[in-house]
Amino acid sequence: MEKDSLSRADQQYECVAEIGEGAYGKVFKARDLKNGGRFVALKRVRVQTSEEGMPLSTIREVAVLRHLETFEHPNVVRLFDVCTVSRTDRETKLTLVFEHVDQDLTTYLDKVPEPGVPTETIKDMMFQLLRGLDFLHSHRVVHRDLKPQNILVTSSGQIKLADFGLARIYSFQMALTSVVVTLWYRAPEVLLQSSYATPVDLWSVGCIFAEMFRRKPLFRGSSDVDQLGKILDIIGLPGEEDWPRDVALPRQAFHSKSAQPIEKFVTDIDELGKDLLLKCLTFNPAKRISAYGALNHPYFQDLERYKDNLNSHLPSNQSTSELNTA
């Protein structure tokens, strides 16, 4: 990370427009004046500092992002640069410079004409999404906040994951803002405030998979408990053995109910797609499919052109299903 009191970020990058503002800070579309005026996305985040400087957790997260960037994975957004500027003794402005992609999956789904996204396009996008996610998991990165707004879609239909590996960097900025973070893609173990690991991302993938068919979210809760209730209305109340032990909210707080047919809520999905969706939307994270397992699901068996180069982005013998968060 380069620190410059004259703000190198302001010298090298010319802001064109503000393109987003969320719990994590503002995002700007900008020109990179040192690289032919290419468009980039600037994400500006405020980080709490102390006498010792920037928190070690922040430095580690940036180091992980830098390491992932060396692989240039096709389904992960590129990180071009990181700049820091001290604002005060207790705060630093961190500027992350990413490649710019014009639309996210939310915009894409809003714009798609009737009758919706072709089933083959959904399959293609899902495979790319899972390939990017498996790459992150194989490098011990849990996304934690996967949703259509941070899945980018290029003009050629390439999927790129964004906003990963930044949970600790974002924590201070989020405490300063009142923006509500959506619950609609959160796994049951997160809603119950239980321990969690990579399976949380596969739950989010299941929600996104369903939304590609529906063009609207599958579970739209207004609070953690309401969200959990909406989930159980569809997938049914799990057995006692699948309810986490370390949570304040007991299984008995919810009415006993059976699972409803998923095709009632996700029409046009075929049998293999339904099987994959239910494996993602499995209540118990230990029984949920992994990203690597999902990539090898029969649903994708006719996408051999992707499987040919899948292994070039995976470490050998890497199990990705049980990585714990620190």
Curated annotation (Swiss-Prot):
Pfam families, alphabetically? Pkinase
**Organism of this sequence:** Mus musculus (Mouse)
Q: What is the lineage of its organism?
A: Eukaryota, Metazoa, Chordata, Craniata, Vertebrata
Q: Which residues cross the membrane?
A: none
Q: Which residues carry this modification: Phosphoserine?
A: 319
An individual GO BP term: negative regulation of cell cycle
Return the similarity comment: Belongs to the protein kinase superfamily. CMGC Ser/Thr protein kinase family. CDC2/CDKX subfamily.
Gene3D superfamilies hit by this protein: Phosphorylase Kinase, domain 1, Transferase(Phosphotransferase) domain 1
* Identification of the protein by name: Cyclin-dependent kinase 6
Q: What is its main location?
A: cytoplasm
Q: Which InterPro entries match?
A: CDK (IPR050108), CDK6 (IPR028788), Kinase-like_dom_sf (IPR011009), Prot_kinase_dom (IPR000719), Protein_kinase_ATP_BS (IPR017441), Ser/Thr_kinase_AS (IPR008271)
Keyword field contains Acetylation: yes
In this chain, where does the modification N-acetylmethionine occur?
Answer: 1
Q: How is it modified after translation?
A: Thr-177 phosphorylation and Tyr-24 dephosphorylation promotes kinase activity.
Provide one Gene Ontology cellular component.
centrosome
Q: Where is the Protein kinase domain?
A: 13-300
Looking up PANTHER family in the UniProt record yields:
CELL DIVISION PROTEIN KINASE, CYCLIN-DEPENDENT KINASE 6
GO molecular function terms attached to this record: ATP binding; cyclin binding; cyclin-dependent protein serine/threonine kinase activity; FBXO family protein binding; kinase activity; protein serine kinase activity
Residues modified as N6-acetyllysine are: 264
